[in-house]
Structure formats: structure tokens, C-alpha cells
């Protein structure tokens, strides 16, 4: 009797355990189905794969992106007037002028600072005067009408390489190779509102290397200051005038002496006496004899800055050797 009762108790316990395992397994299965489904739903929602199966999620995302861009555009003082245009409020322009000016002074090696300062200081009266200078000249009017771009492709660098050594094109090509630069490195204009003014400033910026090449001035700091002074005297670029006045303050005494004695007087004299360089259609003069072109533009190149620096370095080297022998 006792044995039968004990046996019955064990069977009952096993049934309960089996039933509990079944319930737990069922609960886990249901939980995995429910919560796992929730996790899958969350992933699907995040991937845009849910809700209306006929809805194009990519199109929706693109629409949201466009809405954000429109909201940013609506926060500007005007709609962009040309590709890449970033309209600024007056206080933003003042802030850009101050910050880019300070950064240009302390970090002149960063071209982005110079680019921003150039546009922040490109005041409307200056650009309007430059436009009138171009409109008063036959070639200047044609440049404004045609609005050419100076790029490696438009100039055809292989063609320049094969030109006669005495041509402007070959001289320009040699200068580019020597200095390790390209016509394509000029930044686009962003912060000037009027499209015509923006093109004029872009044209000035793209012609900058021709001013270097026709005068054989390197892109080292002294050469850049000399070209900036030339641009300030000839074209009246505010940023160029600021650079010519302030940049020499950070130079070594020997560099300052060269600039103040030779290159700045040359730049101011040449800039005031030569033809308006903004009206020169450089692309059409590539096959011209560079010496004849200089005479036509009334430009006399300055002394060779590279040669002067090499001579100075050689003198220092000889002086150092002489000093070491006497020690």
C-alpha cells in the first residue's frame, strides 16, 4: 500500500515537471516570437522596410534631405544666385573678414584663409569699379561676355609644353612645373552675391599665376607679396593691399630689406604704369613672344628673386665655412 502510494507520488511529480518544462518552453517560444518579432520590426523600421510596402523609402529619405536643405537655404538672406553661392548676412561677412584676416596673418601658409579673406574684403564698390574698367575696354567687355575659365583642360597643357621657348604659353608652362602648381588649384568663388562680380573676382583669381609667370616670380612669401602689391596698385584688390602692407611684418630682416628696397617699389611702379591686367585675355596670347608681350603691357620684370636668394645662401655658407676654419 505504501509502495503504491509512493509510486503514485513519483509519477505525479514527473508529470508536473514535464508540464512545467512544456510551459517554460512554450513561454520562451511565444516570447521569442513576440519580442524577437519586435526586434526584427525595429530593425526593419530602422531600415525603412516596414509600414506601407509600396512606399519608396529612398525617395522619402531624399525628400527629407531636400527639406533640410531648403530649411537651411531659407535661413540665408537670399536664394543662391549661382552654383556654389553661399549668401551671408552683414554680420557674418564682418565676422568672416575678422577671422580670416587674423588666420591669414598668423597662418599665411593656409590658402583657405587667404581665399576667405579675399572674398570677405571684396567690397561692392571695388568690384563695381573693376567691372567698369572691363566695360570700358573692348577686350574686357568680351571677357565679361564670354566668361572663359582658365583650367588645365582649356589651356591644353600638352600644347603649351610643345610651344616655342620664347612664347608666353611655354613660359607659363615652365613656371607651373617649376613651382609645382596647376591652373586647377584656384578655389571657386562662394561669398560674393552678384554673379557678374563673382565672375570678375574668379577671373582675377585665375589670372594670378599669369602675373607670377610673366614676371618670373616664385610662390615663396616674398614673391607672393610682390605680386599682391602689383595687383593692389594695378587692379585695386583690397586683400592684395592688406597683404602687401601687413605680410612683410612677419618676415626676417633680410627678407624685409629685399622687399622694401627692390620688390615693393618695383610692384607699385609697375602696377601703376602698366595696362589694366584684368583686361588681358591671356588665353589668346599664349603663342605671343613673352618679351614682346611685356613691352606691349609695359611690364619690366624685377630682378630674379630665386637667384638673389641662392646668392645669399651661398654667401652665408661661405661665411660659415670661413668662421669654422678660424675656430
Curated annotation (Swiss-Prot):
Pfam families: Coq4. Its EC number is 4.1.1.130. One of its GO terms (biological process) is ubiquinone biosynthetic process. Keywords: Lyase, Membrane, Metal-binding, Mitochondrion, Mitochondrion inner membrane, Ubiquinone biosynthesis, Zinc. It catalyses: a 4-hydroxy-3-methoxy-5-(all-trans-polyprenyl)benzoate + H(+) = a 2-methoxy-6-(all-trans-polyprenyl)phenol + CO2. Zn(2+) binds at residues 208-209, 212, 224. It comes from the Eukaryota. Pathway: Cofactor biosynthesis; ubiquinone biosynthesis. InterPro entries: Coq4, Coq4_euk. It is found in: Mitochondrion inner membrane. Its cofactor is Zn(2+). GO terms for cellular component: extrinsic component of mitochondrial inner membrane. Component of a multi-subunit COQ enzyme complex, composed of at least COQ3, COQ4, COQ5, COQ6, COQ7 and COQ9. PANTHER family: UBIQUINONE BIOSYNTHESIS PROTEIN, UBIQUINONE BIOSYNTHESIS PROTEIN COQ4 HOMOLOG, MITOCHONDRIAL. This protein may be expected to contain an N-terminal transit peptide but none has been predicted. Lyase that catalyzes the C1-decarboxylation of 4-hydroxy-3-methoxy-5-(all-trans-polyprenyl)benzoic acid into 2-methoxy-6-(all-trans-polyprenyl)phenol during ubiquinone biosynthesis. Belongs to the COQ4 family. This is Ubiquinone biosynthesis protein COQ4, mitochondrial. It comes from Lachancea thermotolerans (strain ATCC 56472 / CBS 6340 / NRRL Y-8284). The lineage of its organism: Eukaryota, Fungi, Dikarya, Ascomycota, Saccharomycotina.
